[in-house]
UniProtKB/Swiss-Prot annotation:
This is Small ribosomal subunit protein eS6. Belongs to the eukaryotic ribosomal protein eS6 family. The keyword Phosphoprotein does not apply. Keywords: Ribonucleoprotein, Ribosomal protein. SMART domains: Ribosomal_S6e (SM01405). Disulfide bonds: none annotated. GO terms for biological process: translation. Residues 190-212 are annotated as: Disordered. GO terms for cellular component: ribonucleoprotein complex; ribosome. InterPro entries: Ribosomal_eS6 (IPR001377), Ribosomal_eS6_arc (IPR020924), Ribosomal_eS6_CS (IPR018282).
């Protein structure tokens, strides 16, 4: 039996995230949902973002209302930096610089049940999507804009920026179709010249998202890069 193809990983970028960082106290609680599809492991990415409860003041200070995705950056007891993205929800009456997350998740991420972290509006995060979503994305190309409801983020628009397959071969905006081709390149994606004017024939994928049902595991599209589309002037 052939190996199951892993779900498509989507990397989302927010060009309006900014640089504002707030130091917060993070408390682990039992009454916040934490399911297997919210976990990130070595084998798989999250299908849904875990939930973080924040005060209204912090929600507004970090301008989370536009997108609602918060990153917490922890330092583990052994000094390792760990970043976890969350779907932010306002809890009325919560102390201004306190964030509540699931107790089990906090233990996995920070090795503590209560700790401090840097909180900021997420600049980028990633989720995995099932094949039925991948199928709906099939046929779209680099530069196309689609509705965020397709990936569980209604009210937002996303623009496709590129992607790579399981072997690291990138999608190329100048190549039509969804197959793999060898083309002469003078620059990225697919080739980074060391000398001025240098060109090389390299393998790239076409600019179109393929239907996953027709792809082999070893060469399937593995990652799609998208950006929140606020308007062409911001991209």
């Amino acid at each position: 039996m052939s190996e199951e193809r892993p779900p498509l990983r989507i990397v989302i970028s927010d060009p309006r995230a900014g640089d504002r960082v707030v130091r917060v106290k993070v408390k682990g609680v039992e009454d916040i949902e934490y399911t297997d599809d919210m976990r990130k492991t070595k084998e798989s990415d999250r299908r849904r973002l875990p939930i973080a409860r924040v005060s209204r003041k912090l929600y507004e200070e970090l301008n989370l209302g536009e997108v609602g995705v918060l990153t917490l950056r922890f330092t583990t007891p052994d000094g390792k930096k760990v970043k976890v993205p969350f779907k932010a929800e306002v809890k009325e009456g919560l102390e201004d610089n306190v964030v509540e997350v699931n107790m089990e998740l906090l233990g996995e991420a920070a090795g503590e049940l209560e700790t401090e972290a840097d909180a900021f509006r997420a600049k980028s995060w990633q989720i995995a999507v099932p094949d039925d979503v991948h199928v709906k994305l099939a046929g779209l190309e680099i530069g196309d804009v689609f509705d965020g409801g397709l990936i569980g983020m209604p009210g937002l628009k996303f623009k496709i920026r590129g992607g790579t397959d399981a072997t690291g071969i990138p999608m190329h905006p100048g190549v039509p179709g969804s197959g793999r081709y060898k083309v002469l390149l003078a620059g990225p994606p697919g080739f980074h010249p060391r000398e001025r004017g240098e060109r090389r024939r390299k393998s790239v994928r076409g600019r179109m998202i393929p239907d996953p049902r027709g792809e082999r595991r070893k060469t399937a599209l593995a990652q799609l890069n998208i950006v929140i589309h606020y308007g062409d002037k911001e991209e």
